[in-house]
Amino acid sequence: MRRALPALVLLTSACTVTGTAVPVGGNLALVDAGRTSAALDAVKAAAEAVLSYDSGNPGAFDQAVAANVTGAAKDQLTQLFDQVRKSPQPVHLVTRVRQAAALEFTGDRVRDLAVLQQDSSGTNGLATVAFTALRDGGRWRLSDIAVNPAQPAPAPQPDDGSTGGLRDAALAGARAAAGALFTTDSSDPAGSYARAEAVVTGPLLDDYRAKKATYVEAIRKSGTKVALGPDPMAAALSLGGGRATVLFFTTLQVTDAAGRVTGRPFTTELDVVRAGSTWKATAVRPVTAA
């Protein structure tokens, strides 16, 4: 990613929240596929409207906020765009939602995990955001915005063959696979590799085994210890036939040889497949700016 955009810098500092889980059985994400998709489309339109800005037409931004935002998100956006609106230079900021998946959907409330790309004067930036939106008078309005989110997962449904149970089993499997794939320790490179190999299958496993020596040496030379951040985020982009594609986000905690810890936001897609009582990854696609 090239130079970070002011909007993304402000979002990161101003809009991180914890969130809450919904009761078991209350999460209809992908269970009611049609309404889930419609809610995601509405949140996408709202997010792109209120996270874009043209200094030549500031009234359009105010109108977008009035139409698409409620609750805490109003103050978050005011704080977010304060610096942008005061810029002495012309600003033409365009935001688009690259990917989005529902974390939870209850009919009148949706929380989704979205990858945003912002472009301004040839510069682009990427951020992963959790949006909460409420259905108000037939219209979906953003009520909370969290960039680089760390929020607890909704209460899982039983893995009983239902769509909700399959979804939550796949998400738990994806989080477990991510923990093995993206957690490394330069003082134990062989163990780090072994943990990763144990959670992959298919051509990805073949690739790991073919490059084992390279992976182990790279981990050893890194001189770091990498762990997932608290409350990693996972949402299903697609689900069916014992397979799922999952959008995953965490702020990796990277500890260097001197003990200094740096947070590194990390977003990826994971393809996972059921393998007996567990789930294994068949593909890993880190999300980067276009």
Model-derived segments and spans:
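A mature extracytoplasmic/lumenal domain signature
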Residues: 81, 116-118, 146-149, 212, ...
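Core segments of small alpha/beta cavity-forming domains
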Residues: 31-86, 162-221
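Surface-exposed, charged secondary-structure patches
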Residues: 86-123, 220-258
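A broadly structural signal marking compact, well-ordered functional cores
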Residues: 16-22, 196, 206-214, 220, ...
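A compositionally biased, intrinsically disordered/low-complexity signal enriched
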Residues: 40, 50, 69, 102, ...
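Juxtamembrane and targeting peptides
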Residues: 2-45, 111, 127, 146-183, ...
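Intrinsically disordered, glycine/charged-rich N-terminal periplasmic/extracytoplasmic linker segments
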Residues: 70-78, 82, 96-105, 110-111, ...
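Short beta-strand edge/turn micro-motifs at domain boundaries
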Residues: 124-158, 245, 265-290
